[in-house]
Amino acid sequence: MRLWLVRHGETEANVAGLYSGHAPTPLTEKGIGQAKTLHTLLRHAPFDRVLCSELERARHTARLVLEGRDVPQHILPELNEMYFGDWEMRHHRDLTHEDAESYAAWCTDWQNAVPTNGEGFQAFTRRVERFISRLDAFSDCQNLLIVSHQGVLSLLIARLLTMPAASLWHFRVEQGCWSAIDICEGFATLKVLNSRAVWRPE
């Protein structure tokens, strides 16, 4: 099985430097262009199904990538970005004085501290691991397109490679690119990371 990984295109929150987990934030014109470019790069990729975050920025990206193709789609909450609670659509400069104690605790110990009324890294990790455990349900598929978010995709790569969850930072998943992980007999191999090349059958 191959997992094709695509991060949503650039959003208005990305440009503004805001924390955007579950809060709606539309794709910018650049983000739309990134998704359309991926449509061209992956035109010949033989997707059996697409698994997508519930969030509109990911769903919009998926629609653009797959425009003109009839690929069955599954919307999965496990693929949603980490939820930042009261910090959603806020800038870190504001949080340093508006929620100073909690934000300082999170910056010091991001693996265990929890954003105010949000989702901690441990809960986020368990959610992504639930998604991994569900991959067996798609064992009839050879090629799954996964459209999600940087946090989810970086963590997904780390855990599939049996690395600690905190290793996600080693795998920055860029916008406008595609990545691929091959899974054979339960063993995952990272084959492509952040490619801007046209995929062609080998």
Curated annotation (Swiss-Prot):
Its EC number is 3.1.3.73. One of its GO terms (biological process) is cobalamin biosynthetic process. It is an enzyme of class 3 (hydrolase). SUPFAM superfamilies: Phosphoglycerate mutase-like (SSF53254). Keywords: Cobalamin biosynthesis, Hydrolase. Catalyzes the conversion of adenosylcobalamin 5'-phosphate to adenosylcobalamin (vitamin B12); involved in the assembly of the nucleotide loop of cobalamin. Also catalyzes the hydrolysis of the phospho group from alpha-ribazole 5'-phosphate to form alpha-ribazole. GO terms for cellular component: cytoplasm. SMART domains: PGAM. One of its GO terms (molecular function) is phosphatase activity. Pfam families: His_Phos_1. The active site is at H8, E81. Belongs to the phosphoglycerate mutase family. Monomer. The keyword Hydrolase applies. The gene is cobC. It catalyses: adenosylcob(III)alamin 5'-phosphate + H2O = adenosylcob(III)alamin + phosphate; alpha-ribazole 5'-phosphate + H2O = alpha-ribazole + phosphate. The lineage of its organism: Bacteria, Pseudomonadati, Pseudomonadota, Gammaproteobacteria, Enterobacterales. This is Adenosylcobalamin/alpha-ribazole phosphatase. The keyword Hydrolase applies. Pathway: Nucleoside biosynthesis; alpha-ribazole biosynthesis; alpha-ribazole from 5,6-dimethylbenzimidazole: step 2/2.
